[in-house]
Structure formats: structure tokens, C-alpha cells
């Protein structure tokens, strides 16, 4: 219940902040909210603003959502190994030392998040630590470090911002046309039609746009695998992916899943955030990304 309330409060705060920003933009530019340019600005503020605020808050939100425990002073040999391995890989990749955390989960997984290359988070599940060899776990950590080094969080946020902007703009634009054709029904009915149509269209356009964002996510996974192979060797990365084929399905959600080592299965590859494991293994063996 606390987690739900925190989620709702956070989203309400984001909406209020973006509303204030939008009104300031309108006041400074003299732009009319009901104009086409005003609609586009509103879509951009909420489309990009929401995506970037989520990115800025991603470390804290990710840790809270999975109940992650940050390793500050290693309490055992495993935690010491995690810090030492991530630190060495971060130095090799030319990034700052990420915050390292462990979270309780049966699935073999890990994820990276954070707004900056030098202020990021790498978290691993207890399932990964219990079920993978050190070589396999090292490859998974290298995969996450590669995501950070490649700047995948920022590029995915930029893409999501563009997608959000067009989804909001097109939905509201079409809804406005539909509602304006019902002038004889009265102002109250027009507003209901407008919001009803815009909500339906946002769902439809958002679903269609997910094909693009998932394609890009799969594309970045191949490059993160390649980066991991450069850091620890191709055979270790292949061994880690082979191990994942026998694991539980990912329990991560949202951006954590997008930058995890293991994704959710889907009826169609087009809606998967990660390529099929066999394709990832084949790409590593052939070195074709």
C-alpha cells in the first residue's frame, strides 16, 4: 500500500511541476494554449519532461521498487567481489564507479539505471548470485556496465520523449477535430468527447509506438552484449546467456527491465525489450551486431 501511495504521490508531483513549467512557457512566449503551437509545446513539456524526471529519479525509485540494499561496506566475500568487479569494469569502460546493490528475487537478473555515466546504479538479484558461476556473473555485470558506458539510459529517454510528444500531440489534435464536429451537442458533451477520444487514441498510439521503442531496446542489448564481450571475453558472455535460458522469467518492470540482462517473454518478438537469447548468442559467436 505504501508503494502504491508513493507512486501516486510522485506522479501527482510530476504533473504539478510540469503544469507550472508549461504555464511559465505560455506566459513568457505569449502562446495560446488552444493553438496548434500551444498544443505542441504542451505535448513536448509533458512528453520530454515526464521522461527526464523519471530518469533523474530512476536510481531511488528502482531501489525502492525492488527493495534493493546498497553495498557500502562489504559484509562478506561475495559483496567484496561485487564491488571489486564492478569497480574494475567501470574503470575499463571509462565511467565513474556505480552504486552497487543487491535485491531479493528468485530470477537470475541484474539491471543498471541512472541519469549520468558517473552517477549510476548496478543492482543484481540474489537469484543471480546463487545460480551463476563467478565467470557468468562477471559477464552479466559487464553487460550492465556497458549499458552505462554506452549512454543507453539517456538515449532511451530521448527516444521515449519524442514518442511521448507525438503520441500526446496527435491524440489531442485528432480529439479536438472530432469534438469540434459535435458543436450542436453542447460544451459539456464536447469536453467529454474530447477527453474520451484523446484517452483512447493515446492508448492506441502508445501501443503502436512501443514497437519502435522495443526495437531500439533490442538493438541496444546486442551492443551491451558486445561491450561485455570486450570487457570479459566472448565465452563468458555466451556462458551467461546460456545460463539465462534455464532461468525464471524476469520479474523486473519498466526501465529496469529494459536495461536488465534478462527480459520478459512475449507472444511476438516485436514487443520484447530483449532479443531472444539464441539470437544474442548467435550474434556474439558471429560478431555481427
Curated annotation (Swiss-Prot):
Q: What family does the database annotate?
A: Belongs to the peptidase M48B family.
Q: Which residues form the active site?
A: 144
According to its UniProt record, this protein's enzyme class is hydrolase
Q: Which CDD domains match?
A: M48B_HtpX_like
Name of the molecule in the record: Protease HtpX
Q: Name one GO biological process term.
A: proteolysis
Residues annotated to bind Zn(2+): 143, 147, 221
Question: PANTHER family under this entry?
Answer: PROTEASE HTPX
Organism expressing this protein natively? Vibrio campbellii (strain ATCC BAA-1116)
What does the record give as the organism's lineage?
Bacteria, Pseudomonadati, Pseudomonadota, Gammaproteobacteria, Vibrionales
Needed co-factor(s) = Zn(2+)
Q: What does the note under cofactor report? A: Binds 1 zinc ion per subunit.
Which HAMAP family does this chain map to? Pept_M48_protease_HtpX
Amino acid at each position: 500500500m505504501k508503494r502504491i501511495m508513493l507512486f501516486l504521490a510522485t506522479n501527482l508531483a510530476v504533473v504539478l511541476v510540469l503544469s507550472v513549467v508549461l504555464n511559465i512557457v505560455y506566459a513568457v512566449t505569449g502562446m495560446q494554449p488552444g493553438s496548434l503551437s500551444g498544443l505542441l509545446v504542451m505535448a513536448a513539456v509533458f512528453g520530454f519532461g515526464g521522461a527526464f524526471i523519471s530518469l533523474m529519479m530512476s536510481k531511488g525509485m528502482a531501489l525502492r521498487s525492488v527493495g534493493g540494499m546498497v553495498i557500502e561496506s562489504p559484509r562478506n566475500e561475495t559483496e567484496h567481489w561485487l564491488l571489486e568487479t564492478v569497480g574494475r569494469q567501470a574503470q575499463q569502460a571509462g565511467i565513474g564507479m556505480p552504486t552497487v546493490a543487491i535485491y531479493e528475487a528468485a530470477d537470475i537478473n541484474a539491471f543498471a539505471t541512472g541519469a549520468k555515466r558517473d552517477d549510476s546504479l548496478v543492482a543484481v538479484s540474489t537469484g543471480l548470485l546463487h545460480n551463476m558461476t563467478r565467470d557468468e556473473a562477471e559477464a552479466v555485470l559487464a553487460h550492465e556496465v556497458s549499458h552505462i558506458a554506452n549512454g543507453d539510459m539517456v538515449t532511451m529517454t530521448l527516444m521515449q520523449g519524442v514518442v511521448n510528444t507525438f503520441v500526446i500531440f496527435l491524440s489531442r489534435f485528432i480529439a479536438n477535430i472530432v469534438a469540434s464536429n459535435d458543436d450542436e451537442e453542447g460544451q459539456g458533451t464536447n469536453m467529454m468527447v474530447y477527453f474520451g477520444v484523446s484517452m483512447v487514441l493515446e492508448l492506441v498510439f502508445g501501443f503502436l509506438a512501443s514497437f519502435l521503442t522495443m526495437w531500439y531496446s533490442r538493438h541496444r542489448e546486442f551492443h551491451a552484449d558486445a561491450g561485455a564481450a570486450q570487457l570479459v571475453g566472448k565465452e563468458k558472455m555466451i556462458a551467461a546467456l546460456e545460463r539465462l535460458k534455464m532461468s525464471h522469467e524476469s520479474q523486473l518492470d519498466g526501465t529496469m527491465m529494459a536495461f536488465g540482462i534478462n527480459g520478459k517473454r512475449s507472444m511476438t518478438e516485436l514487443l520484447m525489450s530483449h532479443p531472444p537469447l539464441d539470437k544474442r548468442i548467435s550474434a556474439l559467436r558471429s560478431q555481427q551486431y
